[in-house]
Amino acid sequence: ARFQKLVEEQRALMVKDEFDKIYTEAGASGMNAGTNQDSTFYFVTVPANKLELWFWMESERLLQPVFREFYSERDVVQEERRLRVESTPTGPFDEQLNAMFWTAHPYKWDAIGWMSDLKTLSMADAQDFYSTYYAPGNLTAALVGNITVAEAKVLAEKYFGRIPPSGKPVPDVVTLEEKQLAEKRMNAECDCQPQVTVAYKTVPFRHKDSYAMSIVTGLLNGQTGRLYK
């Protein structure tokens, strides 16, 4: 009860949705973010003449973050997991299939995380992860539009150049996937339409053949795919 009271007092002091409001008033749209096993990405569409605003906003996001709503946002992620994984007919099976598919590699962990981890994740855990991975040396910016490279470089140095290095090297992934010696098969039943998932280990995403593999996936997957037909 005491903790909840402190959370409510904190919320009373916050400016709600200020980040989104600044972008919207500048004519920006489509602000969102996503996470997968390899990266976290933030994207937004802004008018070309608001390029400096983008550099300022995104560098401020990374410069000195204060996790004011950490616990409420942690609750949001837990609820998202319930909706997307635990409350769908096939969600738990898809998650366990992925965990079975990978023997040793960290890809066996779903990007949203296990509920037991989400419930025990502390602010100190999040800050340690942030200081390690959300560092300038681990950052890539992709800009598309009516802008020049020279202009972008000047603004990048002006704003992102303020962010100090973390001093904590990103640890290498040293656990490599073991060679698969036999077919893995999972059979499950649920209140849903029949579904077949076929998974293969192929090439890393930076490999020259990864683009062809993406096209093959598109050709085979979904109700318009060759396998379905």
Features from the language model and the residues they span:
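Non-catalytic, conformational "gating/processing" segments within enzyme and secreted inhibitor domains
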Residues: 67, 74-75, 94, 123-159
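Non-catalytic beta-strand/loop surface segments
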Residues: 4-49, 83-138, 162-207, 218-229
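Short, glycine/charge-rich beta-strand/loop segments that flank catalytic centers
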Residues: 37-40, 71-80
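A common structural junction motif
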Residues: 60-67, 159-167
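Short, conserved charged micro-motifs
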Residues: 51-53, 149-153, 208
